[in-house]
Amino acid sequence: MKHIVYQVLPRLWGNGRFSAWNESAFRYLSTLGVDCIWFTGVPRHASGKPFVKGDPGCPYSISDWKDVNPYLADNPDSRMAEFENLVARCHKAGFKVLIDYIPNHVACDYQGDVRHFDYCDGDWTDTLKNDWSDPRTFEAMLDILRFWLSKGVDGFRCDMVELVPADALRGLISALKAENPETIFVAEVYGKENYSLYSESVGFDLLYDKSGMYDSLRAICCNGYTARSLTWNWQWLGRLQPQMINFLENHDEQRAASREFLGSAPRGYAALAASLLFNTASFLLYFGQEVGENASEGAQGRTSIFNWCRPVSIGRLVDSVESGKRLPKAEAAVLRKYRELLGYAQLDAFSKGNVWDLCYCNYDSRGFDADRHFAFLRYDDSSAWLVVCNFSDRPADMSIAIPVEVQSACGCSCKAVCVDPWDAAVVRLK
């Protein structure tokens, strides 16, 4: 199933509390085709201590795995009940709820049953590395995940899984899937050589394709790398394509519209179309991305996960969602484009249909540049669509040849297409 996941730090949305997620917010996400909400920063993390990074601190430095952050509640004494109410509201509105699971480390002030060493990985100085050689850690983690499932959570985005024994993760997923088969497990994986292991052996439902699709798109857009790399990536993935989750942004990566990445949201439309529409892989949308949030208030093009901040465009987006206040023209235009492309992703031909990379048969086609253009078909029994992405500063006017093998599915053998710079054209053929 092609999921559209919306990642959000609830402390930076609206009033910064669970209560900000109301019918207006859910209606808004429905217009984007979102079906899963990943709430980042729910389990209680370290805050206000000398070792903590920032104020209120990092969501990945967990001090109590069976509590939620008090600052997310209207009444801190009722914070867990307020979280359960949030989950119930999400379910009523038709959304699944994901939270973070961090198996590699805990906060320096962690109190609980997970066994850990007295050192950290790298510069994660607000954490201590977990000791998975102690069987009590596995039992404690299984209990923690069961706890969150009992609260109604539908799945987990699992942090830095390559730093944890694969056998331990396999055991956790197997045990929990036996009890709750629909539980979703998303793996943050960076080594492409490990994709098959974590998908087919360990049992994750979705894997980050950061080292494939994301890195390829970034190299194409920022470094002039050839668009042929998109073909090479799916050929390498093969049968694993549906198990990937693609993205242009998340909390670890720079905002696409930041000066450190693309410089503007419109310059990312071609990359968005390729990442979102090429195959049945799921897609992750980071809050504010859809209006061109550029993290201008933060460092290095990232919205801070350590400090209180108020990204300006996210504030305007929330005002628009809650009160109907108009967005500035530029942000409204970005949102329209995102809604357009996300709308295509909901169609059967895109969400579960067939894909045909057209680049190989268009090297000599009029106007087609295999290094700067990417063209493909999405089709099923009822419709066929041509998508052409233009990764260049110049408008592209081209004729795209349709190979004989899929002409009956498309109803044509050739199609003329015009695509603006850094944009994508989506054309219905049938």
Regions found by a protein language model. Name each.
Residues 34, 150-153, 204, 280:
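A structural motif
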Residues 143-146, 159-244, 261, 265, ...:
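Active-site-proximal helices and loops of the catalytic beta/alpha 8
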Residues 2-36, 41-151, 172-180, 194-196:
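Substrate-binding/active-site clefts of carbohydrate-active enzymes
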Residues 4-6, 37-39, 97-99, 156, ...:
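Hydrophobic faces of well-ordered beta-strands that scaffold small-molecule active sites
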Residues 8, 29, 39, 65, ...:
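Conserved, mostly hydrophobic/aromatic
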Residues 47, 250, 255-399:
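Loop/helix patches that line or flank the sugar-binding groove of alpha-linked glycan CAZymes
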Residues 394-411:
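Beta-strand-rich binding/interaction modules
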Residues 415-430:
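C-terminal beta-strand-rich structural cap/linker in extracellular carbohydrate-active enzymes
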